[in-house]
Every structure is written in structure tokens, then in C-alpha cells.
């Protein structure tokens, strides 16, 4: 490049050119991209390399397209005046309904198994409270079935020897009277008092209980009750579970109530139903239970209307004459509303139904959805819980706790508790094979209540579940006006199943329905999501630094790509120079003086030499006199070229 052209280009580059006064559109765009706040346009100009420029062009055009698209949607939405109307008829799935008779087995069917136990129970009541003729008010069939086969004078009582009943007097601490022998005995070990379920105005001074010991009788625990009712029933239930645990399942099903016996009439959603719509579920403590709308059905029934007319209506035959007087002290049935894949814990959360009454249960559905980790410690399906599910049902907290306890029971006591399902390769506890199981069970249960087994720490709440809020109301049924004809009709309808005339204390009416179809959903959502986090970051960067996504990309390019690239190049160049110096031997020759074009001070690629640099130049050799005259400089038209480019600059002042 000629020296004059270089001076012209240098001045043109250094002097600012204002936008509207740029001579060409290209210069105007160049100025705009260099001075605009739109980061993408600026990066297109200042980026070095074709690939980077193409990437910045793509980023910028994509951002412009998104802006145009979103703005167009906003404008169209603003000027749209149409109205949309949605009409939705909601239908709710009807839950599964499990119904059990409070009395698990017909007394006439199990009386042969319980004869000795019932006889000793009656003798205990006679000795403790002077109660005579416990079964005299019952029909003759029961009296015959419950006749005593052993007396005090005959064979010694087997059940009272296994678990002796004791009478405690507060005035004599540490001693108790054995009600069978009448002798006082010293009580060693722990004494655990269980509060009574019956309200007392004044606490009795006498306590009734029983003692459980290990095999060697060295370690014992005594359980006392303030009410004799609770003590007798708890003592009776322990022996009852031991006896029934040895009965095969098929025989127990035959000893309990069939669906045709339990269900007198059935209606759902205004349509007739029968025993075929119910599924048998055998519960260890409640016998044969029957589930309506179970998961084994082909389709899950639903309802499209609320109210008692569009739910489940059944009349139940309770058959009070077949009740075990020592096992249960109330008459009626138990009902539980639950999901189709949920195990019915009828003994824990079931609702009792009275006889001679119409029980209406209105339901309201609530669905809960919780967030799993890291927001909470819930589980989706229980796969992350280190407890084996021994129930043939979906995971729940209650299933996990009972499964954990049953597993611990098998590990510690060598057998399983009768009221829960069997773990793999386990057997139910009984006296013959496991004489120590009662003491072990009570000790383990106390540790479970005190949360010492670790079950409460490993079991987690389910993340999603359904819950039905129940509202119960009662009405006398049947009324005195309709009692006569209604009972006669029901007796005639059930003549094939029931060989007696029905009375109202044998029957119970149940209505289960949705109060309305309003479903409440409780859903957890994170208070700070990733979208909200990015939005907050963008708001802060835009407010304080006028920075956007393109600005962030620009920062990444400069400080994480270019910055380290420069450092890498410098280090590489230093390494190359060091290697070159190491391989090249030092020169002993005196360097020749550089003159003319070899002198770096006269490099035409730089600016003109200053006065100081010019003084250091060697004297120029004498040049021959040219044979031609010097050129005419006015013919180069330098003035016109400078004037056209520098019209608004103060060129005269700067030079």
C-alpha cells in the first residue's frame, strides 16, 4: 500500500463517522452494529471467523423470529372477541365397599372348637363377678352347643393354666390372687396397665389381668385392665386366635356367612344387584367379608349423579342368634370405603352399622398428590422402601407398617400373628408349635408402639392417594307402620336361605352414595421451579445490567472461549520460542548493520517515523541526480479525496 493511501485509511479508521452521515448503507449498518444495544447484531460484526459470524447470525435471526411470533399471538389474542363455552358432565368412579358381619363365624359352626374355652370363661365370670347363667337368655340350640364338658371338679382348666387370670388389689402391691386356685402369688417383672374402653366415674380398686411368661418362666410381663370386660375379652381373644389359627381356610370359609345369607336386597344406581356383584374376602378376625365394585370386576362402576338414590343400597341379615357372646359385645356390621387396589383394613377404620336402623353414608372424594424427593419423603409405589409387601394390594403406609411388624414377628418369635397375612414360608402361631408366642407377641407389640422396631422410620407415606370423607346419619328402620308387612315380605323372599321369621333386630339397612360430584384435589407444586429460577435470573440481569440470553452467550464466548484461547496461544508461542532457542546454537558473528529497506525503523507497514526515530537513522547514501523532473503532485487529486471523506472533521486543527 502506498504511503498516502495508508495515511488515508488510518485516519478514516480512527476518526468517528456518525450514523446518518455515513456515505454508504454498508457503512451505516457497520456503524449501527458497532453502537447498538442489541448484542446479537454487534457480535455479528466484531466476531472473528466465518463460523462464529454464522452462529451469531443464526442466534439473532431465531430470536427475531420468536419475538415476531409471540407478538403476533398477543396481538391476535387482544383483538379476538369470540367467546368459548364448555359444558362438561362429570362422572366419578364409585369406590370399593367392603361389608363384614361383626361376628366372624356362626356360633353353631364353631361351638365344638370353643366348648372348653367358653366353659372356662363362664367359670371365670362366675368366680370374679358372680355372674350366673351367662347363656340362659339365648336360644336352646346355643345352650346345648355351649354346654360345659369340663368342670372345676373334673379335668383341670387348660386355658387358665396357660394364661392365668389374676386379681390385683391396690392395697397389696406386688401380689395378686390367682382366681383359679384362690392363692396369692408374688408378681415379678413388668406390670403394664391398659386403660379401659368403658367409662368409669370412679376407678375400681381391683384390677383384673393376666400374666405372660417366656418358656423358662424367668421373664414375665403382667397386663392389667381397669375393666373386667376388657380383661376377659382380651384373654378370650388370645385363646380364640390360637384355636382358629389351626383351622384350614376352606373350613373357616364354610363356617362363616355366605353372600346369599348376608345380602338380603341390593340396588346400585337404581338398578338391581345381587351376590354375584360382590367378591369374597376372608378376614382372619371378621370371617367372610364381601367387596362391592372390586378390582376383579370387568369394569369399575361409576355414577353420574349425587344423592342416595344413585348409590349403593343393601339390606343385611345380621342373624344375632349366631353371635359369639364372649368374642363380640355389639351387634351389627362393619363397612369400609376404599380404593379398588387397596387392602381393606376393616378392623382399624371400618364404620359400624346398627341393626334395626337405616345408616346413610354420604361420601366426598379428596385426591392428594404430593411431591417426592427432595420436597418430601413420600414414595410413589413403595419400591424404594426396604420392607416386603405381604399384602396382595397397592402400597400404603398402613400396609408397610403391618408388613414390617409381621416380618419382625416371624424373625423374633418364629411364627406369624393370626390377624395379618402370612409372609413367605411362615406359619401362624399356636401353642403346640410355639408355646412362647403370646409373650413374644406382646413384648414385640410394645416395642412397636414405642417405635423401637424401626418400622416407623423406614415406612413412607404414599405420594398419591384417595380419601373419602364420610358423613353418617341414622334413622329408625323399619318404622312401626311398615314393620309388619315389610318383615313378612323379606321373610318370604329369603325363605330358601333363612328358616325363621325375621325381626328388625336381625336386619340392617345401608345406603352409601356421593353427596355431590365435586371432587377436591390437593396437589403440591414446587415453590421455585427451574422456569421460575430462570425467569428471576433474567429479571435481575435485565433490570440491573440490561442483559439477556444473547448477552449471556456473549459473555460465555468472550470470557470462556476467547479468554482461554488467548492464554493458550500465548503459552504455546512461549513454548515454541523456548524450544527454538534451545535448538538454535548462539551465533558468534557480529550482526551487520541494517540499512535501507532492512532497517526496521523504515518499515513501511507502520506509521511514518517520528522525529526521534528519524534522528537514529543512518545517513542516507548519496543518490544520483535523477534524469527526469519531479512529478506534479497536484495531479494526484489528494485534496478532493480528503475533502470528500472528512467534510465534518476538523482536519486542519488536528494537523
UniProtKB/Swiss-Prot annotation:
One example GO MF annotation: sodium channel activity
This protein's record includes keyword Ubl conjugation: yes
GO CC entries: apical plasma membrane; external side of plasma membrane; extracellular exosome; membrane; nucleoplasm; plasma membrane; sodium channel complex
Record keywords: Cell membrane, Disulfide bond, Glycoprotein, Ion channel, Ion transport, Membrane, Phosphoprotein, Sodium, Sodium channel, Sodium transport, Transmembrane, Transmembrane helix, Transport, Ubl conjugation
Primary location: membrane
Annotated site residues (Cleavage) in this chain: 143-144, 186-187
Composition bias, Polar residues: 585-598
Subunit structure: Component of the heterotrimeric epithelial sodium channel (ENaC) composed of an alpha/SCNN1A, a beta/SCNN1B and a gamma/SCNN1G subunit. Interacts with WWP1 (via WW domains). Interacts with WWP2 (via WW domains); inhibits the channel. Interacts with the full-length immature form of PCSK9 (pro-PCSK9); inhibits ENaC by promoting its proteasomal degradation. Interacts with BPIFA1; the interaction is indirect via SCNN1B and inhibits the proteolytic maturation of SCNN1A and SCNN1G and the activation of ENaC.
UniProt protein name: Epithelial sodium channel subunit gamma
Organism expressing this protein natively: Mus musculus (Mouse)
Amino acid at each position: 500500500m502506498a504511503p498516502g493511501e495508508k495515511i488515508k485509511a488510518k485516519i478514516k479508521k480512527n476518526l468517528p463517522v456518525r450514523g446518518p452521515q455515513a456515505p454508504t448503507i454498508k457503512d451505516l449498518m457497520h456503524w449501527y452494529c458497532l453502537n447498538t444495544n442489541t448484542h446479537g447484531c454487534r457480535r455479528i460484526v466484531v466476531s472473528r471467523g466465518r463460523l462464529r459470524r454464522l452462529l451469531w447470525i443464526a442466534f439473532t435471526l431465531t430470536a427475531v423470529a420468536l419475538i415476531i411470533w409471540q407478538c403476533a399471538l398477543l396481538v391476535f389474542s387482544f383483538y379476538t372477541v369470540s367467546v368459548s363455552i364448555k359444558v362438561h358432565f362429570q362422572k366419578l368412579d364409585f369406590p370399593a365397599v367392603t361389608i363384614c358381619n361383626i361376628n366372624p363365624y356362626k356360633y353353631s359352626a364353631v361351638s365344638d372348637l370353643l366348648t372348653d374355652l367358653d366353659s372356662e370363661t363362664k367359670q371365670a365370670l362366675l368366680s370374679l363377678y358372680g355372674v350366673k347363667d351367662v347363656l340362659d337368655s339365648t336360644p336352646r340350640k346355643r345352650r346345648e352347643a355351649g354346654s360345659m364338658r369340663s368342670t372345676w371338679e373334673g379335668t383341670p382348666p387348660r386355658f387358665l393354666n396357660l394364661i392365668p387370670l389374676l386379681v390385683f388389689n391396690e392395697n397389696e402391691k406386688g401380689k395378686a390372687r390367682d382366681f383359679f386356685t384362690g392363692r396369692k402369688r408374688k408378681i415379678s417383672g413388668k406390670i403394664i396397665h391398659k386403660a379401659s374402653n368403658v367409662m368409669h366415674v370412679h376407678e375400681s380398686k381391683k384390677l383384673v389381668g393376666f400374666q405372660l411368661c417366656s418358656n423358662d418362666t424367668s421373664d414375665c410381663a403382667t397386663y392389667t385392665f381397669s375393666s373386667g370386660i376388657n380383661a376377659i375379652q382380651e384373654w378370650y381373644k388370645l385363646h380364640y386366635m390360637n384355636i382358629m389359627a389351626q383351622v384350614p381356610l376352606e373350613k373357616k370359609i364354610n363356617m362363616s356367612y355366605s353372600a346369599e345369607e348376608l345380602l338380603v336386597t341390593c340396588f346400585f344406581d337404581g338398578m338391581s344387584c345381587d351376590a354375584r356383584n360382590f367378591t369374597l374376602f376372608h378376614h382372619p378376625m371378621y370371617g367372610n367379608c364381601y367387596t362391592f365394585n372390586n378390582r376383579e370386576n370387568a369394569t369399575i362402576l361409576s355414577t353420574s349423579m349425587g344423592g342416595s338414590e344413585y348409590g349403593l343400597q343393601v339390606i343385611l341379615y345380621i342373624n344375632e342368634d349366631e353371635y359369639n357372646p364372649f368374642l363380640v359385645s355389639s351387634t351389627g356390621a362393619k363397612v369400609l370405603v376404599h380404593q379398588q387396589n387397596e387392602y381393606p383394613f376393616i378392623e382399624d377404620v371400618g364404620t359400624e352399622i346398627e341393626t334395626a336402623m337405616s345408616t346413610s353414608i354420604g361420601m366426598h372424594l379428596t385426591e392428594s398428590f404430593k411431591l417426592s424427593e427432595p420436597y418430601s419423603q413420600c414414595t410413589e409405589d413403595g419400591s424404594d422402601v426396604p420392607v416386603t409387601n405381604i399384602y396382595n394390594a397397592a402400597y400404603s403406609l398402613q400396609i408397610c407398617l403391618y408388613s414390617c411388624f409381621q416380618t419382625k414377628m416371624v424373625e423374633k418369635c418364629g411364627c406369624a400373628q393370626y390377624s395379618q397375612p402370612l409372609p413367605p414360608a411362615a406359619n401362624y402361631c399356636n401353642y403346640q408349635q410355639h408355646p412362647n408366642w403370646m409373650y413374644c407377641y406382646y413384648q414385640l407389640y410394645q416395642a412397636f408402639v414405642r417405635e423401637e422396631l424401626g418400622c416407623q422410620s423406614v415406612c413412607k407415606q404414599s405420594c398419591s392417594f384417595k380419601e373419602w370423607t364420610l358423613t353418617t346419619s341414622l334413622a329408625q328402620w323399619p318404622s312401626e307402620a311398615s314393620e309388619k308387612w315389610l318383615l313378612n315380605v323379606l321373610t318370604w323372599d329369603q325363605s330358601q336361605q333363612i328358616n325363621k321369621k325375621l325381626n328388625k333386630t336381625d336386619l340392617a339397612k345401608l345406603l352409601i352414595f356421593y353427596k355431590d360430584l365435586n371432587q377436591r384435589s390437593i396437589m403440591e407444586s414446587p415453590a421455585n421451579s427451574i422456569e421460575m429460577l430462570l425467569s428471576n435470573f433474567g429479571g435481575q440481569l435485565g433490570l440491573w445490567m440490561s442483559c439477556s440470553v444473547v448477552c449471556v452467550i456473549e459473555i460465555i464466548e468472550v470470557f470462556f472461549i476467547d479468554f482461554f484461547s488467548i492464554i493458550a496461544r500465548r503459552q504455546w508461542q512461549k513454548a515454541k520460542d523456548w524450544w527454538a532457542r534451545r535448538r538454535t546454537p548462539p551465533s558468534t558473528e557480529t550482526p551487520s548493520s541494517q540499512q535501507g529497506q532492512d532497517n526496521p525503523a523504515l518499515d513501511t507497514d507502520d506509521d511514518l517515523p517520528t522525529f526521534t526515530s528519524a534522528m537514529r537513522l543512518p545517513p542516507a547514501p548519496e543518490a544520483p541526480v535523477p534524469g527526469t523532473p519531479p512529478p506534479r503532485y497536484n495531479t494526484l487529486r489528494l485534496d478532493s479525496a480528503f475533502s470528500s471523506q472528512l467534510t465534518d472533521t476538523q482536519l486542519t486543527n488536528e494537523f
